[in-house]
Structure formats: C-alpha cells, structure tokens
UniProtKB/Swiss-Prot annotation:
<dbReference type="GO" id="GO:0015190">
    <property type="term" value="F:L-leucine transmembrane transporter activity"/>
</dbReference>
<keyword id="KW-0029">Amino-acid transport</keyword>
<keyword id="KW-1003">Cell membrane</keyword>
<keyword id="KW-0813">Transport</keyword>
<dbReference type="InterPro" id="IPR001123">
    <property type="entry name" value="LeuE-type"/>
</dbReference>
<feature type="transmembrane region" description="Helical">
    <location>
        <begin position="50"/>
        <end position="70"/>
    </location>
</feature>
<dbReference type="Pfam" id="PF01810">
    <property type="entry name" value="LysE"/>
</dbReference>
<dbReference type="GO" id="GO:0005886">
    <property type="term" value="C:plasma membrane"/>
</dbReference>
<keyword id="KW-0050">Antiport</keyword>
<protein>
    <recommendedName>
        <fullName>Putative leucine efflux protein</fullName>
    </recommendedName>
</protein>
<comment type="similarity">
    <text>Belongs to the Rht family.</text>
</comment>
<dbReference type="GO" id="GO:0015297">
    <property type="term" value="F:antiporter activity"/>
</dbReference>
<comment type="function">
    <text>Exporter of leucine.</text>
</comment>
<keyword id="KW-0812">Transmembrane</keyword>
<feature type="transmembrane region" description="Helical">
    <location>
        <begin position="28"/>
        <end position="48"/>
    </location>
</feature>
<keyword id="KW-0472">Membrane</keyword>
<keyword id="KW-1133">Transmembrane helix</keyword>
Length: 191
C-alpha cells in the first residue's frame, strides 16, 4: 500500500471526526475501489487508460476534486473549526460521499487495477469472474486492515491533538498542502 489521497483522507477524518468518521471515509474508499476493480475486470478501465481524452477527463476531475477538498480543509483551519464536527450528524454523509468521489476520480488507481489484474487473471481460463472476485476480495481485506490501523492510530492522535490547538492547525495545513501536491501530480500524470 502506497499512501495517497485516499489514505490521507481516511487518516484526516479519523483524526477530525473520530473512528466513525474514519470508517465512513474508509467505506467510501472501499466502495470506490470495488467499482474501479469491477471496471478493470469489465474492460472499461482499459478503455479509459488507452483513450487519452477519457483518461484526461478522469485525471483533471481528480485533480480539481483534490483542490476542492484542500480548500475545504484550509477554510476550516482558517476559521478555527473542525470541518466534520462530531456532533453534526449530517456531515458524516459528506465524509462518505467525498471519500467515494475521491476514490472514483483517482486515475492512478485505475492504472493500478488494470496492470494488477492482468498479471494474475488468465483471460483464456474458464471462470475468470471467480478469480477476479477472490483477488478483489483479497485486495479489499488488505486495504481494510491497513486503513483500520490508520483509523485506530488517528483516534489515538486525536486524544493528544485536542489539547494542542496550534498543532491541530499545523496538521490540517500540512494535509491541505499534501492534497495540493497530489492534485499537481495527478494533473501531470501520463496514461
């Protein structure tokens, strides 16, 4: 697992909104990844990878969405309040939705799944769907374990940060800057 925007988003939400916020973000990532894996298996991801205009649309949507998320983080940091407050239940739905969109607009994930499944699934073998399902389930379980570790770690960090307001602002600012970096890298990504 290479930390990227999805990982950072889950970690940020586990720190700012507790374990519930972290797991809602993780669920958005899991569902988004499952959709991308299915698209890779169905051949749609290959079409996106080999069609420059489609790849560029996904790439720029992803970059703009990362910048949007960064602006929300920066705004909340400057205002001195948490973007996803624990007492505000409707924000939990926003966490899930943002994670899902973030996952679906990640062309690096599309490229990964296309190249990953090709290595392990023989398209000429019978029952490729079963092989795909087993491999996709394994990937999701590994992702669940990895993100659970981050969520639990984030919950512990939250206890420390609550007493250090300045540290929390610096942390949010750094996360925002990392999203800008991810957006710039995504905008310059080649298929």
């Amino acid at each position: 697992m290479v930390p990227g925007p999805n990982t950072l988003f889950v970690l940020k939400n586990s720190v700012s909104s507790g374990m519930k916020g972290g797991y809602l973000a993780a669920c958005g990532v899991f569902i988004g990844d499952a959709v991308l894996m299915f698209l890779a298996w169905a051949g749609v991801a290959t079409l996106i990878k080999t069609t420059p205009i489609l790849f560029n649309i996904v790439r720029y949507l992803g970059a703009f969405y990362l910048l949007y998320l960064e602006s929300k983080i920066l705004y909340a940091t400057l205002k001195g309040k948490n973007n996803e407050a624990k007492s505000d239940e409707p924000q939990y739905g926003a966490i899930f939705k943002r994670a899902l969109i973030l996952s679906l607009t990640n062309p690096k994930a599309i490229l990964f799944y296309v190249s990953f499944f090709v290595q392990f699934i023989d398209v000429n073998a019978p029952h490729t769907g079963i092989s795909f399902f087993i491999l996709a389930t394994t990937l999701e379980l590994v992702s669940f374990c990895y993100l659970s570790f981050l969520i639990i770690s984030g919950a512990f960090v939250t206890q420390y940060i609550r007493t250090k307001k300045k540290l929390a602002k610096v942390g949010n600012s750094l996360i925002g800057l990392m999203f800008v970096g991810f957006a710039a890298r995504l905008a310059t990504l080649q298929s």
